[in-house]
Amino acid sequence: MSQSAVSFQINSVSKVQEQLIQQKINLKTKPLGALGQLESLALQIARIQGADQPYIANPTMLVFAGDHGIAAEGVSIAPSEVTRQMVQNFAHGGAAINVFCRQVGFKLEVIDCGILTPIEGVKGIIDQRLGAGTGAIHLEPAMALETVDKGFAMARDLIERHHQAGCNLVAFGEMGIGNTSAASAIMAAIMQLDVIDCVGRGTGINQETLARKLMLIELALLLHQSALTGPKEVLACLGGFEIVQMTGAMLAAAERNMLVVVDGFIATAAALVAVTIAPNVRDYLIFAHQSDEQGHLRMLEFLQAKPLLSLGLRLGEGTGAALALPLIQAAVNFYNQMASFSDAGIEAVV
């Protein structure tokens, strides 16, 4: 363990009020379970907040960006330069995530965790660089173990700033050419799966590129096999700067009893690491959607997660998490505002 190791103290969400919360849901003017997954979501949120009137305040979308050494081997449909171009697009408001955040009321913040070349003089990009792209994981570790802890510390400070500003819900998105390779490698290492069960086509690669991607990830796992002794070591050997900071931010948000909305395949890989580090994190995670990346369903099942949406998305950026916000708000609103049978003078049908 590095001398500057960062640790998190995350409480398990109390079940003391669970029966009362469930009773309140059951007594709304509807048949039992008629609001489906919104009911379990309302129960989760009310348990996390421990409040009679749960609420969403200053919802914030954090998009973490970083480049990957493995991308130089052509494992994606786009070169690494596109990461930087998309980060600029985020800053100028032109990406899908910008459109959706404006629509649903998310504050959007973009974090440069380590793209190849920094973007200077552009408002709206937070500098939390850990380097200029990771090492190529099939040849060397992605980063030093100390860099993982540095990323965790940066992420904790980021979350603390938003918590102090009154945010109680944070969603996670990402941008990084090659990061499905890193996420697949992390998944294979932690879940002890064959690489072929973890690797998909990312943003739409062809069969030849997929075969190369599979081979390189298998090489990476073989190269680092003896070093993969824990979740931080998995991040150091196989991860990305953006995945490291997402993981740390999820841990920090759970530590502050915030709601954590997880986007797609890459964000779920970060959640997988976070839960491996601190299992209590799982109580705070809301999984926005099931993406079209083939390994995502396996990860969701491993985490016993039922996502809110299944739209065939495979873009990343936090787009699925943004689209889930109205559903999260609907769960809170029905819990707070919907009449009970006694309030409405209706004979109970429970």
Swiss-Prot record:
It catalyses: 5,6-dimethylbenzimidazole + nicotinate beta-D-ribonucleotide = alpha-ribazole 5'-phosphate + nicotinate + H(+). InterPro entries: Nict_dMeBzImd_PRibTrfase (IPR003200), Nict_dMeBzImd_PRibTrfase_bact (IPR017846), Nict_dMeBzImd_PRibTrfase_N (IPR023195), Nict_dMeBzImd_PRibTrfase_sf (IPR036087). GO terms for molecular function: nicotinate-nucleotide-dimethylbenzimidazole phosphoribosyltransferase activity. SUPFAM superfamilies: Nicotinate mononucleotide:5,6-dimethylbenzimidazole phosphoribosyltransferase (CobT). Pathway: Nucleoside biosynthesis; alpha-ribazole biosynthesis; alpha-ribazole from 5,6-dimethylbenzimidazole: step 1/2. GO terms for biological process: cobalamin biosynthetic process. Keywords: Cobalamin biosynthesis, Glycosyltransferase, Transferase. It holds the Pfam family DBI_PRT. Its EC number is 2.4.2.21. NCBIfam families: cobT_DBIPRT, PRK00105.1. Catalyzes the synthesis of alpha-ribazole-5'-phosphate from nicotinate mononucleotide (NAMN) and 5,6-dimethylbenzimidazole (DMB). HAMAP family: CobT (MF_00230). This is Nicotinate-nucleotide--dimethylbenzimidazole phosphoribosyltransferase. It comes from Shewanella putrefaciens (strain CN-32 / ATCC BAA-453).
